[in-house]
From Swiss-Prot:
Single biological process term from Gene Ontology: cell wall organization
Catalyzed reactions: Hydrolysis of (1->3)-beta-D-glucosidic linkages in (1->3)-beta-D-glucans
Region spans: Disordered: 379-437
Residue positions of the active site: 128 (proton donor), 239 (nucleophile)
UniProt keyword Signal, yes or no: yes
Name the UniProt record assigns to this protein: Probable glucan endo-1,3-beta-glucosidase eglC
Gene name in the database record: eglC
Chain's role: Glucanases play a role in cell expansion during growth, in cell-cell fusion during mating, and in spore release during sporulation. This enzyme may be involved in beta-glucan degradation and also function biosynthetically as a transglycosylase.
Keywords, comma-separated and alphabetical: Carbohydrate metabolism, Cell membrane, Cell wall, Cell wall biogenesis/degradation, Glycoprotein, GPI-anchor, Hydrolase, Lipoprotein, Membrane, Polysaccharide degradation, Secreted, Signal
GO MF terms held by the record: glucan endo-1,3-beta-D-glucosidase activity
Propeptide feature ranges: 431-460
Amino acid sequence: MQLAQLAAFAMTLATSEAAYQGFNYGNKFSDESSKFQADFEAEFKAAKNLVGTSGFTSARLYTMIQAYSTSDVIEAIPAAIAQDTSLLLGLWASGGGMDNEITALKTAISQYGEELGKLVVGISVGSEDLYRNSVEGAEADAGVGVNPDELVEYIKEVRSVIAGTALADVSIGHVDTWDSWTNSSNSAVVEAVDWLGFDGYPFFQSSMANSIDNAKTLFEESVAKTKAVAGDKEVWITETGWPVSGDSQGDAVASIANAKTFWDEVGCPLFGNVNTWWYILQDASPTTPNPSFGIVGSTLSTTPLFDLSCKNSTTSSSSAVVSAAASSAAGSKAVGSSQASSGAAAWATSASGSAKPTFTVGRPGVNGTVFGNGTYPLRPSGSASARPSAGAISSGSGSSSSGSGSSGSTGTSATSGQSSSSGSSAAAGSSSPAAFSGASTLSGSLFGAVVAVFMTLAAL
């Protein structure tokens, strides 16, 4: 009995720092109808039981607010509690609705307390607000964004709200496109967060050679650039994927076969090693968007459109993607900003024509509020209310059409070496999963604890 208890304890330690893997979940279906608790539960249950996987047990939310309400708590929260699904909470920061998001956050903490606290892995203040605030975002009619100074104030406000509550120890970050992170005009946000949420879609990098054959390379480069500005802060993969159907973008072709290739070459190395929320479990219910990224079809099912088993993921693909996403070992801050930026020169001239989709099913509406239509179409309405004013647009584009993924200025100390530093990246030089940001591998202290337990077992 004692042996069994010690072994169980050792396994608990070994899995306590496992990376989170899950999907993004909006508060509406593709026809703009609301999702309710039963709908979220069905999605979470399907994700946990996907054929060929160990289960996707985490959910990233874009908003705290139930669709079409003013500040009611999103019903994904009781659904997550019922299904034991961990949560990356999101507060929609654009469009003037932050007060309502804060109200919903406070209500959720008060209503669910420790039940919520034990499931929340992080809080994202905003989603792609800096992208929408950029020149590129304005050109794409992506909707209303937030300038970096305002976003920093929102981050401070959320820290104040959760202090002394069941969420007091939860880390706070922001999610944005990789080329928004590398834009030096947004460096204040990098400084304000605990971690950086990375959104990157090689499929949309249409100004470059973005066929599926080059997708892994584009992904690695964009993650490396993000790590260069992150320094010793973790980078979480908060959105990526490849569409199963829809129109082509440059050399990129949407197909089930290509979606599987991207899953094998990019997703499989990340899963279990880096905190990752894939886009998306299902986006074709009841109507199919163009393009469509869902790995299950129009009927929610545990049977995916392609094999998710990762048996075709190669060692070379794994080590390369791992290295691109590498930071410090869990619980360690060993890789400083100067080390992380040293390899960025290799990709200083890389860029995206469009580093992200300008749509997404189930997000808040085009006008930047939760009262929008729930969908970002490929070309949103060009109405004045759907675009940031000229004065609100960042001085530097997160991604210029001519090349560099960062603005021309030197930016923060973490990025100042991008164009002049030499040598290989500190991240890229390691193929060890222990170097992952958000790694499932053990930190030194945790590893020591596990070793101690097994030494005790051996002595009995």
